[in-house]
Amino acid sequence: MASDLEATFATLWRQLDGPELVPEYRFHAARKWRLDFAHPSTLVAVELEGGIYTNGRHVRGQGFRDDCEKYNAATADGWAVFRLTADMLRDDPIRNLTAIMDVIRYRDEDWQ
């Protein structure tokens, strides 16, 4: 089940006519890591960072370290990883989402 943040992202992405993304995409077989949203053919990923103002797992010691390890592994495998917070989607969704679309477009000449 998608979080409120994931649902908000998906709604905004559709409104801006973004290409299809795969939710909860498993990119690392050994570690079973998943990316919140992925465009696998271009290796573009979106990670949504919830709980940043409520001392959520992503901003506490081990959780932050684990996320860094995951993002570094994705980057080493060629992924462009975009990290977004709820306020980034609220305050300037067009700028933040079109930046992701621009990289997808750059990596995939067949898309628009």
Please identify what each model-predicted range represents.
Residues 1-112:
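Nucleic-acid endo/exonuclease domains
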